[in-house]
């Protein structure tokens, strides 16, 4: 397959310094709102990259579940490969991609586990079958076949027919950003890139060469 000529030329929008909020979280919320209103497919889907204890990188798509003044929140199995990586090296990079708007957002920062109370609250909001799955799946572990997973989920359902408590190995992380970059595709690959860096407790905004 020849991939050389598969490309898009971007021309829908531009991003100037005057368009940007002083705070990158506010700017992100603006862009996320625009992505939702534009009916972008999976606007909260984000790639999370981490490094394990051997220095090997790994990445996964997860769903952003909250953004606030502290950072970006997602939930996962703490025993999964990404969970073990984040516990070993508590730093992550996130990338949002909204092709319909020709936009990307990159986030880098320190990672912390959420307070158990907050993980409990979110877990209670999940559909019943999803809560069963959190108990049934030893995420990232090799299993002999799918039937084993289905049987485990059924067993959890028999044990917890009404209320499924949060497993201790499942919960949230928050990425506390020290760098956020907004990328807007432009013609001739002269893309707009506006970066915010945290310095001495305040955000510095600067333009990057594409």
Swiss-Prot record:
Its cofactor is FMN. This is Pyridoxine/pyridoxamine 5'-phosphate oxidase. One of its GO terms (biological process) is pyridoxine biosynthetic process. Disulfide bonds: none annotated. Catalyzes the oxidation of either pyridoxine 5'-phosphate (PNP) or pyridoxamine 5'-phosphate (PMP) into pyridoxal 5'-phosphate (PLP). It catalyses: pyridoxamine 5'-phosphate + O2 + H2O = pyridoxal 5'-phosphate + H2O2 + NH4(+); pyridoxine 5'-phosphate + O2 = pyridoxal 5'-phosphate + H2O2. Belongs to the pyridoxamine 5'-phosphate oxidase family. Substrate binds at residues 7-10, 65, 122, 126, 130, 189-191.
